[in-house]
A protein has these predicted regions:
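Short, low-complexity N-terminal intrinsically disordered segments enriched in polar/charged residues
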Residues: 8-44, 52
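Sec-dependent bacterial lipoprotein signal peptides
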Residues: 1-8
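Surface-exposed, charged secondary-structure patches
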Residues: 72-141
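Short, well-ordered alpha-helical segments enriched in acidic and aromatic residues
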Residues: 45-70
Length: 188
């Protein structure tokens, strides 16, 4: 009896497949890495990376995430932010990304950044920002700016994340559109 075995080069190496997500994030073992990862998630349009920067509201051991919009947006979109969680963060971010052409770049610039109240497990980060999201909705500006205040805490797993996010409109802001406004307008 003769056995004939054929194969398609079992011992040959195959061409590796490209990964679906090529963004490399460092584990946030310090609070500065949270900012680096946040900027990367926006630059590379990565919702999963974006929400990883926020305190995981679904983890009962984690400090609950809270977003505080600037007062003008809070008044204009009454009730929208009362129970804002990382689920809403993901929804707004995915929604806006669906309206940005794939060949256009997003950008988050953080300037005048101050680290305050540094302890072994928390820090307050204040910064001015310019956020560029080149979406296709003509009635909504593509650039927003303002000030932010993050309370960043170390979670039980040793990783740092944003536990509280406050957004502010600067008095002399020439753009007049804050990140809060972008979140509100792209949530639905």
């Amino acid at each position: 009896m003769m056995l004939l075995v054929t194969s398609c080069s079992l011992l040959d190496t195959r061409t590796p497949e490209s990964p679906s997500n090529t963004v490399q994030y460092d584990p946030a073992f310090d609070y500065q890495t949270v900012l680096v990862n946040l900027r990367k998630s926006i630059q590379y349009k990565d919702p999963a990376g974006y929400v990883r920067c926020l305190s995981d509201t679904t983890d009962l051991n984690a400090t609950q995430y809270m977003f505080e919009p600037n007062i003008e947006v809070l008044t204009r979109f009454s009730g929208l932010f009362t129970k804002w969680t990382i689920t809403q963060e993901r929804a707004y971010f995915q929604n806006i990304l669906s309206k940005i052409p794939t060949d256009l770049s997003c950008d988050l610039q953080l300037v005048n950044t101050i680290y305050d109240g540094i302890t072994p497990d928390s820090v307050i980060i204040q910064s001015d920002y310019i956020l560029t999201l080149p979406h296709t909705i003509a009635s909504i500006p593509q650039v927003s700016s303002g000030g932010l205040r993050f309370v960043v805490k170390r979670q039980n797993n040793g990783l740092w994340s944003i536990q509280r996010w406050s957004d502010f409109l600067h008095v002399n802001d020439s753009i007049g559109e804050t990140w809060s406004s972008i979140k509100a307008q792209f949530y639905n």
